[in-house]
Regions:
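Active-site acid/base region of carbohydrate-active enzymes
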Residues: 77
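C-terminal/peripheral segments of proteins
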Residues: 3-66, 74, 84-271
Length: 271
């Protein structure tokens, strides 16, 4: 049994209780990846289940790169990096940095070209619909759209981080990161800010990976409390939480969990 805010009913053809308030689902990719991992073998250990909660494999990246083969004419050396990439949005990955900027450009160009301007600010097209739309383009349309967006992505990366692609690493304070802000942090003096402020940590993933870190460059959503329970030996369970268990900035428990959480480290959950 798995769930990742996606439409689980599509897997149950005999489901007939449709008297719900609404039917809005997340993109299918997180759920699809979870199901793929769970179906890959019969037995899993604690480490496997921890790794699944922080899995950063990007199905959209795999689909977009496959669709683009034979259609990219400029910046070939950067596209070849993506062609050899493992599709994991690792915080230390240059390829992940290239891909996420490209995914962003693809989304905005698709909205600009295919969604009427008067309604653009009122609706949000899910990325699986964008990819579906690209897949239905003819060869010439694909080449024009994908080559244009890839050029925009590379130009944007060069403008933001410089022409040296080694500086395009995905996880960094100016790219994908997490920084939780205290509500008063921006208005208090430095002495108080030093007490209440939390650090910035580089992150991986996005809103379409099982380890969800949102589609904002500063992570805005995703799992804070996560738990893996060993029902045979309860004291061998593991969890994460963030930033701490106390709201008092002077308490040692105010942010003691934040660094490990920001680096995907679990702590023993003793019963």
């Amino acid at each position: 049994v798995s769930s990742a805010a996606s439409d689980v009913y599509k897997r149950q053809q005999d489901y007939n209780r449709w008297g719900a308030i609404g039917y809005d689902w997340a993109d299918p990719y997180r759920g699809d990846r979870v199901n793929s991992v769970l179906e890959s073998k019969d037995k899993f250990n604690m480490e496997d289940m921890i790794n699944l909660q922080i899995d950063y494999f990007s199905i959209p990246s795999k689909q977009i790169i496959e669709l683009s083969k034979g259609h990219i004419n400029n910046n070939i050396e950067h596209f070849e990096k993506l062609s050899r990439w493992n599709n994991v949005l690792d915080k230390n990955s240059i390829e992940a940095g290239i891909y996420i900027e490209w995914q962003t450009q693809i989304y905005f160009e698709f909205m600009k070209e295919y969604v009427p301007e008067p309604v653009q600010k009122y609706i949000e097209v899910q990325i699986y619909k964008v990819i579906e739309g690209i897949s239905k383009m003819n060869s010439q349309q694909k080449s024009l759209f994908l080559d244009k967006t890839f050029d925009l992505a590379i130009n944007s990366l060069e403008e933001k981080y410089g022409e040296d692609s080694s500086d395009w690493v995905y996880g960094q304070s100016n790219y994908k990161h997490v920084k939780i802000f205290h509500p008063l942090e921006k208005i208090v003096n430095d002495s108080i800010k030093d007490i209440i402020a939390l650090k910035t940590y580089p992150r991986g993933g996005d809103g379409y990976t099982p380890g969800s870190t949102s589609n904002e460059l500063n992570q805005r959503s995703g799992g804070s409390f996560r738990v893996v329970i060993n029902t045979k030996d309860w004291d061998n369970s593991f969890a994460t939480n963030s930033p701490g268990q106390s709201g008092n900035p002077k308490s040692k428990f105010y942010k003691n969990l934040y660094e490990d959480w920001g680096n995907d480290k679990f702590f023993p959950l003793l019963y």
